């Protein structure tokens, strides 16, 4: 379950940002999760609650935005949306793809008081 380590890293980022911006209590957090991040949403919610325990983000509302994965094709030099790690370019059929977006998790924004 790599969700816990991802959430621990996100909690560190949230704590740092809250400290930098003078936020005493985080009320909402938006995470951007790539479609190829291999993250289970229910596990992410569970682990996020654990990671934020005893921090400024404890009890905050977690919002998850799933973003599509993008890959760059080395053969036709075009960007394409992909649904799996091992795929083919929808433009030319090549398997020479480099994932450029959508395989990670990011703290998109947070709100607090």
UniProtKB/Swiss-Prot annotation:
Name of the featured protein: Hydrogenase maturation factor HybF
Protein role: Involved in the maturation of [NiFe] hydrogenases. Required for nickel insertion into the metal center of the hydrogenase.
The organism of origin for this protein: Morganella morganii
Pfam families, per database record: HypA (PF01155)
One annotated GO biological process: protein modification process
Family (UniProt): Belongs to the HypA/HybF family. HybF subfamily.
MF-aspect GO terms: nickel cation binding; zinc ion binding
Record keywords: Metal-binding, Nickel, Zinc
Signal peptide positions (record): none
InterPro entries given in the database record: HybF, Hydgase_Ni_incorp_HypA/HybF_CS, HypA/HybF
Residues holding Ni(2+): 2-3
Name of the gene this protein is made from: hybF
Record: residues binding Zn(2+): 73, 76, 89, 92
Stored PANTHER family: HYDROGENASE MATURATION FACTOR HYBF, HYDROGENASE MATURATION FACTOR HYPA
Keyword Metal-binding tagged: yes
PROSITE patterns: HYPA
Keyword Translocase (UniProt): no
């Amino acid at each position: 379950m790599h969700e816990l380590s991802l959430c621990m890293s996100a909690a560190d980022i949230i704590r740092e940002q809250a400290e930098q911006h003078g936020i005493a209590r985080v009320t909402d957090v938006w995470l951007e999760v790539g479609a190829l991040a291999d993250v289970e949403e229910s596990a992410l919610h569970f682990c996020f609650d654990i990671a934020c325990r005893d921090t400024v983000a404890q009890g905050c509302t977690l919002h998850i935005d799933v973003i599509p994965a993008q890959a760059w094709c080395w053969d036709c030099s075009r960007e394409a949306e992909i649904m799996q790690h091992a795929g083919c370019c929808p433009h030319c059929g090549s398997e020479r793809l480099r994932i450029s977006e959508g395989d990670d998790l990011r703290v998109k924004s947070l709100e607090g008081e």
